[in-house]
Curated annotation (Swiss-Prot):
Region (Disordered) location: 857-881
Glycosylation positions in this chain: 46, 58, 122, 336, 340, 546, 791
Annotated gene: GLR2.5
Taxonomic lineage of the native organism: Eukaryota, Viridiplantae, Streptophyta, Embryophyta, Tracheophyta
Name used for this protein in its record: Glutamate receptor 2.5
GO biological process: calcium ion transport; calcium-mediated signaling; cellular response to amino acid stimulus
CDD domains, A to Z: GluR_Plant (cd13686), PBP1_GABAb_receptor_plant (cd19990)
Subunit structure: May form heteromers.
């Protein structure tokens, strides 16, 4: 054993040396056996972004092959300098394809260099993989061999749009670099802002070759505009210059809003501290990478290897692009990686170019398929191409401060703005973002629109009208052709502007043609304000929902409502049956039935109490009862009733008749004396059924309202002035005129001031918001003007203006009528009739109870013999002298043998003295 241990210890170092030599030889053999695949890189030298990206590519391939040692392919990089020019990039790519026969190219670094490389790759079937060419315009080339291993700029447009919408800014100005990169985002911005009704007032293009003075001149131009929301889309080198000059001329002060795209926000790490100071208060939209395990490990390795150089988003995309290419190359390792070169006829020197003998990569289609389907979890998130590019789902909203950037929220696809990624509900309010420090070091949200003090005069459009000139009238001097604008609306606007807290210069521009005719409808005038031809519109412009999509209206300054106006007719022709009109048909029937009911109840009560009534013939009974019942109407009963119950019922019934007759008399008097004039038509439905012609003002929105109410379009007539309306009314529908007019209250009042007693307003009154001044969406003038309108309407200024233009119309407001005088119906007297019915039923029950009681008392007394009854009858002989009274005895009881000496039923007692005097 000792000998064995001695040999092992002696030759251990030798055995280890032999093993290491064997391992190195094996690795060298495997490396030599791996397929060398040439890949080109076209990036600019001496550029921080390109340098960081190239480091990331080398680091990605090194770590990938160390992890996947058994792969049969190895990418060999061929790096060419683009010289930061389009021509340099094109020459580099042509060299790599033609001379080096690379199977793929990573690059170029900018969107401007990409178009030629894309066409070159498409022709040679060499995939062009770019991690930094983000312009959406490159998609228009429609080359399948262009792989965008990054997001295009259109993906952030929705995030920018959400910010604008959340703060309710209505106008923006994009400031962009004047090249393919800057212009590429504009179509997407326009579409996104149109969806939320945000207007792009101006597009500011700044060339890379502009001097500082030229940039300053452009910024001064922006200062003269009212818009204060700017969206900056450019790279950091030009962006730093822009913000430095903007800071110098005080455009980063209170009231301004600056938003930068990810062209600057993603590269904040390579910008100096001075740039951050100049951008204090700026908002940024930055690409968001989740802090995955892969990203954290890469950042640690990056810091260890390169020290203070920060890993940015483009370096992450470059890292993932190299990994994806290595995986795809390994997948097609069995494919021929050579080029198929076709000789061209170059015998003529004048047609020979560098594109001659440009080969076609045999591996191109297979490599393209592999790249399109590769999927893995990279450092920048899931690497999976869709339509040849990566898709962005989340952006980070940052607030730039002097010390760096601060996250204030996020934008998530299909969710919107959120304060935290843990919140999945869409935010429609800026409060869902964290507090923001705005330019000027303020936390108050800028309005986004200010009236510049050095601006030119506002161009205020006024309508050209052929009538109703009390509201707006445009006249032109025959010699100078200078327009003069007057009217109620103009005086209101002038008064409002004179009370504004700041001076506003404006001029009236008639909305007419060169020959002085109206240029179009009010809708067209409002739409031209939206298009920017005018800075506002003043006149009798009604506030409508469809118009509010294009302009902002100040508060209304006129009365509201739309009504029908019809002629009135003489109400003295009442007809022969006017006396029936105070009561409705139902009330007449109820009253007649009540008389019949009262008669029946009287019959019942009197039948039990009146012997004379019982002895009458049936026809006499009926006539007596109903005569008695109806005579109560005039309180003229011929004879008193014999029944206590009848008397009570008659008292209640007379009370009801008193109220009924008094109400009838009052209503009939009103019909015969008060109502002298009545509208020819009482309701809109009657107009629709009658099919008469209806007038409306030319160019008014009331035409659409009439069509919506299903009025026949062929029956609608137009008028331009009160005089034309009057003329149409005189002709009537039968002669091509009108029998009704549909217009706003303000115009109807003006017409009624002249013809108050001849026309009337009928129901219903339709809602409208009145007249308002129109301004561009988001205009700060709207709130200030609305405040001044409230001030003058609450004071005496508005009354003075109204008296100036509409004096004498106020008394006509009472001519508005409703239907004919209200008839009395049975509902008004339900309680009285119910009282009569209840009282009658109670009396009937009392009568029946009393009769039953008497019957029981009588049955309890013994009956007299016949002879006693006869004796009693002879004794009294129908009339007895009781003291000094003559007594009339009920003979019926005597005949029924129910009369005793103790009980003598007396029907009527009369003093003897009265009979003697008679």
């Amino acid at each position: 054993m000792s000998l064995f241990h001695h040999l092992v210890s002696r030759f251990l170092s030798l055995w280890l040396l032999i093993f290491l030599v064997f391992l190195v030889l094996s690795l060298g053999k495997s490396q030599k056996e791996a397929l060398q695949v040439k890949v080109g890189i076209v990036l600019g030298s001496n550029v921080t972004l390109a340098d960081l990206s190239l480091r990331a590519i080398n680091m990605s391939l090194s770590e990938f092959y160390n992890t996947h040692n058994g792969f049969k392919t190895r990418i060999v990089l061929n790096v060419r300098d683009s010289k930061q020019t389009v021509v340099g990039a094109a020459a580099s790519a042509l060299y790599l394809i033609k001379k080096r026969e690379v199977v793929a190219i990573i690059g170029p670094g900018t969107s401007m260099q990409a178009p030629f490389l894309i066409n070159l790759g498409n022709q040679s079937k060499v995939p062009i993989i770019s991690f930094s060419a983000t312009s959406p315009l490159l998609d228009s080339l429609r080359s399948p061999y262009f792989i965008r291993a990054t997001h295009d700029d259109s993906s952030q447009v929705q995030a920018i749009s959400a910010i604008i919408e959340s703060f309710r800014w209505r106008e923006v100005v994009p400031i962009y670099v004047d090249n393919e990169f800057g212009e590429g985002i504009l179509p997407n911005l326009v579409d996104a802002f149109q969806e939320i009704n945000v207007r792009i007032r101006y597009r500011s293009a700044i060339s890379l070759h502009y001097s500082d003075d030229q940039i300053k001149k452009e910024l001064y131009k922006l200062m003269t505009m009212p818009t204060r929301v700017f969206i900056v889309h450019m790279l950091p080198d030009l962006g730093s210059r822009l913000f430095s000059i903007a800071k110098e001329i005080d455009m980063l002060s209170k009231g301004y809003v600056w938003i930068v795209t990810n062209g600057i926000a993603d590269l904040m790490s390579i910008m100096g501290e001075s740039s951050l100071v100049n951008m204090h208060g700026v908002l940024g939209v930055k690409t968001y990478f989740a802090k995955s395990k892969e990203l954290l490990h890469l950042e640690a390795r990056w810091q260890k290897r390169f020290g203070g150089e920060e890993l940015n988003n483009f370096a992450c995309w470059a890292y993932d692009a190299a990994t994806a290419l290595a995986m795809s190359v390994e997948e097609i390792r069995h494919v021929n990686m050579s080029f198929n070169t076709t000789k061209e006829d170059t015998s003529r020197d004048d047609i020979g170019t560098d594109l001659d003998e440009l080969g076609v990569a045999l591996s191109g289609p297979k490599l393209l398929d592999a790249l399109s389907t590769v999927s893995f979890k990279g450092v920048a998130g899931r690497f999976q191409l869709k339509n040849g590019k990566l898709e962005a789902t989340t952006f980070k909203i940052i607030n730039i401060e002097e010390s760096g950037e601060r996250t204030v929220g996020f934008w998530k696809s299909k969710v919107g703005l959120v304060k935290s990624l843990r919140v999945d509900k869409v935010s429609h309010s800026s409060r869902r973002l964290r507090p923001i420090i705005w330019p000027g070091d303020t936390i108050f949200v800028p309005k986004g629109w200010e009236f510049p003090t050095n601006a030119k005069k506002l161009r205020i459009a006024v309508p050209k009208k052929d009538g109703f000139n009390n509201f707006v009238e445009v006249t032109k001097d025959e010699n100078t052709n200078v327009p003069t604008v007057t009217g109620f609306c103009i005086d209101v606007f002038n008064t409002v502007m004179s009370q504004m807290p700041y001076a506003v210069s404006y001029e009236y521009i008639p909305f007419d043609t060169p020959d002085g005719k109206p240029r179009g409808s009010y809708d067209e005038m409002v739409y031209n304000v939206f298009l920017g031809e005018f800075d506002g519109a003043v006149g009798d412009t009604t506030i409508l929902a469809n118009r509010s999509h294009y302009v902002d209206f100040a508060l209304p300054y006129s009365e509201t409502g739309i009504v029908f106006l019809v002629p009135v007719k003489d109400g003295k022709e009442k007809g022969e049956w006017v006396f029936l009109k105070p009561l409705t048909k139902e009330l007449w029937l109820v009253t007649a039935a009540s008389f019949l009911y009262i008669g029946i109840m009287v019959w019942i009560f009197e039948y039990q109490a009146d012997e004379e009534f019982r002895e009458q013939m049936i026809i006499d009974k009926i006539s007596s009862v109903f005569y008695f019942s109806f005579s109560t109407l005039f309180f003229a009963h011929r004879r008193p009733s014999e029944s206590f119950f009848t008397r009570v019922l008659v008292v209640v019934w007379c009370f009801v008749l008193l109220i009924l007759t008094q109400s009838y008399t009052a209503t009939l008097t009103s019909m015969l004396t008060v109502q002298e004039l009545r509208p020819t038509v009482r309701h809109m439905d009657d107009l629709r059924k009658s099919g008469v012609n209806i007038g409306y003002q030319t160019g008014s929105f009331t035409f659409e309202r009439l069509k919506q109410m299903r009025f026949d379009e062929s029956r609608l007539k137009t008028y331009n002035s009160p005089e034309e309306m009057r003329e149409l009314f005189l002709h009537k529908s039968s002669n091509g005129g009108i029998d009704a007019a549909f217009d706003e209250v303000a115009y109807i009042k003006l017409f009624m001031a002249k013809y108050c007693s001849e026309y009337s307003i009928i129901e219903p009154t339709f809602k409208a918001d009145g007249f308002g001044f129109a301004f561009p969406l988001g205009s700060p003038l709207v709130s200030d003007i609305s405040r001044q309108i409230l001030n003058i309407t609450e004071g005496d200024a508005m009354k003075a203006i109204e008296n100036k233009w509409f004096l004498g119309e106020k008394h006509c407001l009472d001519s508005t009528t409703s239907d004919s005088p209200i008839q009395l119906d049975h509902h008004s007297f339900e309680a009285l009739f119910l009282i009569v019915f209840v009282v009658s039923v109670i009396l009937l029950l009392l009568m029946l109870a009393s009769r039953g009681y008497q019957e029981r008392q009588h049955n309890a007394s013994p009956n007299l013999p016949n002879d006693q009854a006869n004796a009693a009858q002879e004794e009294v002989n129908e009339e007895g002298n009781v003291g000094d009274h003559i007594v009339e005895v009920d003979t019926a009881l005597v005949r029924r043998k129910k009369l005793t000496s103790n009980t003598i039923p007396i029907r009527r007692v009369a003093p003897l003295s009265r009979l003697k005097s008679a």
